[in-house]
Amino acid sequence: IKNPKNIGFLRIPMSGDIAIKDNILYADMFKDLIAIDINDITNSKFLRKNDNVFEISNGNNEEKIQIGYRVKETIYEPVVCGTGNSNSFILLPMQPPNEPITPSSSSPNQGNTYGKTGIGGSLARFSIIEDYLYVLSSIDMIIYNLKNTQDFQKENTIKIGNGLETIFPYDEKLFLGSQTGMYVYDNKNKTKPEFLSTFQHIKSCDPVVVENKKAYVTLRSGSSCRGGSNELDIIDLEDIKNPKLIKSYPMKNPSGLAIKDNILYLCDGSEGLKIFDVSKSDDIKFIK
């Protein structure tokens, strides 16, 4: 890709996750799930809103809940790679949630290059597989049927457990990262995934990616994660019903990660992006 251009901007208050299929963008907005037609990015169209899909964070103090807020000023600060988390608010000027969602700016270019399906990374809460959207709330996996984009419907809700954070599909399975462990579900039946196994760890934030019967999980400390561990775990999935830890590697404050052909890319807080050769799981090599 050469010379990428900013051709538009959609103002979606409090949005943290998106997925795209057939030029329909699905996103969270506060507690709601919304769908926007982006066939013409200069003239996007609001399609539908499903209310109260997500929970609003109650803050980092377990003994207090957040019941509201006021925006008093705008503060711009640099953010260290990997420090963002889905359980906190960043207050910026924004339109009220009941106002229509419209492009803020765009170029005259009418073309678009959006793909036909959504692809999520290690921090994604959304995943589109065929005609279904999988969405994680803090305790549930919710499945939506996208065959009718004008009126997509909830197909199933599967209660998983507390602290769900990320979803990663691989080889007809779903790998769910939570603050207490990794859950594995068989997804051959797209509307009724079946539980296969879990791998437990201490309470910590937990993105996950998978390749070649191995899962790569980062654990990090932080105010929202309430954990004390900062490490990369490599997990053996040869027996998918009994995942086993191969080895843990200490890190600074790891967050998102990606893998391709045994090369692992890992965002490690203030130390930035790190690249590892993970051909040998028990002896990974730092590349740069």
Show which residues each predicted segment covers.
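Feature marking well-ordered beta-strand scaffolds used for ligand recognition
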Residues: I1-K288
